[in-house]
Amino acid sequence: MGQHEVTARLSELTNTFIERHHSSSRQRPCIPLNEDTRYMLDSPCVEHVDEEAGVFYWTPRPHMDFTLFDGLEQGLEVAIHPSITAFYGSYWSDGLWCSSPFGEISLIQLWNEDDMETLRENLLGHAFQKSKRRQGLTFFIGLTADDRIVTVDNHSGEVYLEEAGRPPQRTLAASLGELLRELEPTLTPYTG
């Protein structure tokens, strides 16, 4: 699965999410503005801050940075599967909840540069744990409603369902593009 296909499907998912949100509420997605969310104002996704209403409006924005894991690749001494790079490098966005044949999942997305750095650190930690347990290298892209991890096999590009610290338990799709085609965005607020 190439970068183009993953990026195209993410574009379809984000556009569907925005259209559904607008049809439901006649406005862009918004997040309550409070002490816990004020840090989120530093993002290309933020469109408008309404202090009076206590919310800020946002929309996914194209990112198209497919070099975001170059340092991680050097540190791990392994090339990261192009579908993973495309998944995280295509958009700035809040995470997206989606329905799927195997239940609801939240797709992890990058909100801003700080999020990107945190993701790199978390992926590195995940990779070290996989190596320590002598398990195949996977990278996470989402979570299920019951806290199982949706991962992509770095070698084959297959998408799996895992529990933390355990090998993959179930194959969800032959590729990330195939998985993304099976998802339908919902209006559930992301709380990742």
Swiss-Prot record:
Coiled coil: none
Pfam families the UniProt entry points to: Syd
Alphabetized InterPro entries for the sequence: Syd, Syd_sf
Source organism, top-level taxon: Bacteria
UniProtKB keywords: Cell inner membrane, Cell membrane, Membrane
Subcellular location: Cell inner membrane
Topology in membrane: Peripheral membrane protein
Gene Ontology CC terms: cytoplasmic side of plasma membrane
Similarity comment: family membership: Belongs to the Syd family.
Biological role stated in the UniProt entry: Interacts with the SecY protein in vivo. May bind preferentially to an uncomplexed state of SecY, thus functioning either as a chelating agent for excess SecY in the cell or as a regulatory factor that negatively controls the translocase function.
Protein's name according to its UniProt entry: Protein Syd
